[in-house]
């Protein structure tokens, strides 16, 4: 079947989203509710297609001896597959809430079978529920469960980060992916998460994935459990050099990113954003400036081409339908109210 962005390989309405697997040349893409979630080279399924996923390796910059890794959010399992291919001594757990996403990854994205003898274990569960039950501690936890249009609020609150802190080893690291900007109201969600995570972890670094920090993009946060001095850019470069001398694969993975030039060193003001808690986490308001902005994901046609127009058209149709539903509801509510008023007057 021909799809606006390529050939439709598979689709399903899951309990959590509408899932599409689309082929466009050598790139296979997982869409959730019309938004790109993961991409894969069909001829090299372990390689990372999207730049932001390469920043997952920052965890090994700060903790080069990491062995036990947890991914929160599976999708197409790009990060876990890449880690398995690059780090022979790493053990990976992945927690993904949607069983149909896991099935699609196995069937269409070369996800290895997990069993007692494999280095990857997959858990179909809500992340907080899983973390509350497990007694395991991790050297590195990667948070990749957010999208441009949806952020599960309970995965970015103070209580959640406190739970993560308990599940980290003494040198543990958190790498979190957030879509936003470093300037304007599109930075609100980034700054609120930064403010919240900083209450728990003593050192938090911010990396942009584009040179223009004002663009809407993937913003990567790196948070350390152990109290450390704040590394400067030069000190981080030396840290990377030390890892390189020790033949650690993370240096190779990060080489082509020029990632140190993306270290955000300006002061990040948080006095106008809330501390996110289980009792108060207005994430829908915070991400509203982000959801209303077109987001140019890599390796897909950009806005204005035939590629993403179906997504924007779908959003417009949804808005029209919601408006019509609201109008009909108001009409019948008023009609029912008038009928009740007449009955009361008789």
How should each PLM-predicted stretch be described?
Residues 22-23, 114-116, 123, 133, ...:
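Extracellular/periplasmic catalytic domains that process cell-envelope and extracellular macromolecules
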Residues 165-229:
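C-terminal substrate-binding/active-site "lid" region of AdoMet-derived donor-dependent transferases
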């Amino acid at each position: 079947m021909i799809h606006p962005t390529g050939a439709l390989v598979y689709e399903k309405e899951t309990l959590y989203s509408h899932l599409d697997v689309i082929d466009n040349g050598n790139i296979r893409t997982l869409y959730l509710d019309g938004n790109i979630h993961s991409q894969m080279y069909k001829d090299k399924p372990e390689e990372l297609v999207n730049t932001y996923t390469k920043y997952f390796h920052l965890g090994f910059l700060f903790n080069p001896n990491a062995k036990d890794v947890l991914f929160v959010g599976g999708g197409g399992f790009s990060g876990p597959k890449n880690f398995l291919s690059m780090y022979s001594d790493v053990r990976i757990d992945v927690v993904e809430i949607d069983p149909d996403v896991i099935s699609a990854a196995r069937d269409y994205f070369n996800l290895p079978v997990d069993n007692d003898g494999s280095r990857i274990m997959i858990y179909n569960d809500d992340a907080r529920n899983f973390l509350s039950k497990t007694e395991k501690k991790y050297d590195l936890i990667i948070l990749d469960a957010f999208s441009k249009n949806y952020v599960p609020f309970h995965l970015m609150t103070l209580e959640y980060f406190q739970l993560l802190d308990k599940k980290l080893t003494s040198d543990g690291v958190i790498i979190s992916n957030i879509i936003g900007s470093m300037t304007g109201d599109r930075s609100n969600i980034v700054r609120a998460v930064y403010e919240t995570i900083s209450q728990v972890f003593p050192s938090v670094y911010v990396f942009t994935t584009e040179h223009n920090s004002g663009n809407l993009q993937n913003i990567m946060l790196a948070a350390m459990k152990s109290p450390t001095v704040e590394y400067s850019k030069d000190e981080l470069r030396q840290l990377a050099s030390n890892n390189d001398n020790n033949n650690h694969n993370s240096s190779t993975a990060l080489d082509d990113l020029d990632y140190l030039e993306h270290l955000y060193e300006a002061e990040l003001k948080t006095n106008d954003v809330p501390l996110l808690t289980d009792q108060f986490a207005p994430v829908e308001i915070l991400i509203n400036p982000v959801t209303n902005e077109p987001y140019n994901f890599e390796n897909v046609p950009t806005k204005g081409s035939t590629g993403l127009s179906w997504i924007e058209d779908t959003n417009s149709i949804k808005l029209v339908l919601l408006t019509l539903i609201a109008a009909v509801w108001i009409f019948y509510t008023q009609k029912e109210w008038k009928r009740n008023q007449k009955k009361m007057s008789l």
